[in-house]
Regions:
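Active-site-proximal segments of metallohydrolase catalytic domains
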Residues: 245-338
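A short alpha-helix/helix-coil micro-patch that ends at or immediately precedes a cysteine
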Residues: 228-249
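The catalytic-center signature of Zn2+-dependent metalloproteases
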Residues: 333-426
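Low-complexity, Pro/Ser/Thr- and charge-rich linker/hinge segments at domain boundaries
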Residues: 200-232
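Active-site-proximal beta-strand/loop segments in catalytic clefts of secreted hydrolases
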Residues: 217-221, 251-253, 307-312, 337-339, ...
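Beta-strand-enriched, solvent-exposed domains that form extended recognition/catalytic surfaces
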Residues: 2-209
């Protein structure tokens, strides 16, 4: 831009080029406020690796954590790309589903790096043309001014105040078919023919949707009534493992192991030990399986058996006897009296599919403080007995958990859909 000035002393006119100050910002995709696990979404939360309002980071191994995210550099800022996973809404894909037929509504967050003004910049969402028929984003562009109309939110991150502006439920993303590989949605700021990337989202590939088969076994040891919650199968389908594009299917619901009034010494001794809480968890599972077979049933290797009963069980944990809601042993599950709820069932199925507690140390898996994340496999209490800040809203699975689930040997990747209504009719 050329500007002309008149010098007062001489009246001489002078021309000079004015350089416009570069406006810098980043745009992040984020989950909607009322998210309950309807689709997979994972991102590098600030609290994982930064000091938030004087609270120390909750991830103990940030160097491992970083390896699980794609990292970009925009405006000399480290940018962690979030992940989105949607079940393909397609009748042509044999694993197509109507669960995510409405797509995912996401928030957009603008992070200010410099002071901003309405300069006519447009924000465009770009998808490779090869995937334009399969991945749909609405709208395809917005004006920067839309952000500037929103109030500024200030967050103190690592002792620095960061300004954000949020457009809630601003974009909708749908997957309408098979993605043979992960697909990026790039966020491009455009003005006067110039482009600058300021954000990105990666859509998880949909070419493999494995299946896990669950067999429920009700173990009756007394006359007190008990049952599993009515909503847990819905949650398996709509609020949990769908995030990992994994089909967890209960194929048998009416299996019963009734141990009441049995005279066999094996049964009598086991019930005495069970009810007096004098038995280790491996022995509980061993006895349930042996008695299940003894009374005419079979144990199939590639199925997950979930035994549930109404006895309290206590286990030794770091020198302390604690009541346990449930546990997984050698790929099968036992749910005890205190665990007959949807969250515990999902937590234990996660273990059966190979997931580890995020607060226990394993090679190449990020380590977190106990009871600090919104992850299904975390605990509702911290190491110090205080409540997890996300209790009641622990609906997420990490992206690396999606990957780990797909490595589980009990899953089937090639199968004929003998239960075609699984995804669509409950």
């Amino acid at each position: 831009m050329i500007a002309t000035f008149t010098l007062h002393a001489t009246g001489q006119k002078v021309s000079a080029e004015l350089k416009e100050i570069e406006r810098k910002y980043l745009i992040h995709f984020r989950r909607p406020d009322k998210y309950e696990g309807e689709f997979g979404f994972d991102w590098m939360r600030d609290e994982y690796i930064e000091i938030i309002d004087s609270n120390i980071p909750i991830c103990k191994t940030p160097e491992i954590l970083e390896k699980h995210y794609e990292i970009r550099n925009f405006h000399n800022q480290k940018y962690y790309v979030p992940w989105l996973a949607l079940l393909p809404f397609s009748t042509e894909h044999k694993y197509g589903s109507s669960i995510n037929k409405d797509g995912a509504n996401l928030n957009l967050e603008l992070q200010e790096l410099t002071e901003l003004k309405n300069d006519g910049t447009k924000i465009v969402f770009k998808i490779d043309d090869k995937f334009s028929d399969v991945v749909k984003i609405t709208p395809t562009s917005i004006e920067l001014s839309e952000f500037l109309n929103e109030k500024v939110e200030v967050r103190n991150i690592s002792q620095e105040d960061i300004n954000y502006r949020v457009l809630k439920n601003k974009v909708n993303i749908k997957c309408l078919g098979v993605l043979e590989k992960n697909v990026s949605i790039k966020v491009i700021a455009t003005k006067n023919g110039k482009e600058q990337q300021v954000g990105e989202l990666i859509l998880f590939k949909t070419n493999k949707i494995p299946k896990a088969k669950i067999i429920l076994v009700k173990v009756i040891t007394n006359d007190e009534p008990f049952s599993l919650p009515n909503d847990f199968e819905y949650a398996l389908k709509y609020k949990s493992f769908n995030q990992a594009l994994t089909r967890v299917e209960v194929i048998a619901r009416n299996q019963v192991l009734d141990l009441r009034n049995r005279k066999e010494k094996t049964v009598v001794d086991f019930l005495y030990d069970l009810q007096s809480q004098r038995i280790k968890k491996d022995k509980i599972m061993e006895n349930f399986k042996k008695l299940y077979i003894y009374f005419g049933k079979k144990i199939y290797e590639n199925y997950i058996y979930l035994f549930y009963h109404n006895n309290e069980i206590s286990l030794l944990d770091k020198g302390i006897i604690r009541k346990t809601k449930g546990f997984t042993y050698q790929g099968n599950i036992i749910i005890n009296l205190g665990g007959l709820n949807t969250h515990t069932i999902i937590h234990e199925i996660g273990h059966a599919l190979g997931l580890k507690h995020p607060f226990e140390e394993y090679e190449n898996i990020p380590l977190f403080e106990k009871g600090t994340t919104d992850n299904y496999i975390d605990y509702e209490q911290t190491e110090y007995g205080t409540e997890n800040p996300h209790k009641g809203k622990m609906f997420s699975l990490f992206k690396w958990q999606w990957d780990n689930i797909h490595k589980n040997k009990k899953l089937k990747f090639s199968y004929e859909d003998d239960y075609k209504s699984f995804w669509d009719i409950f």
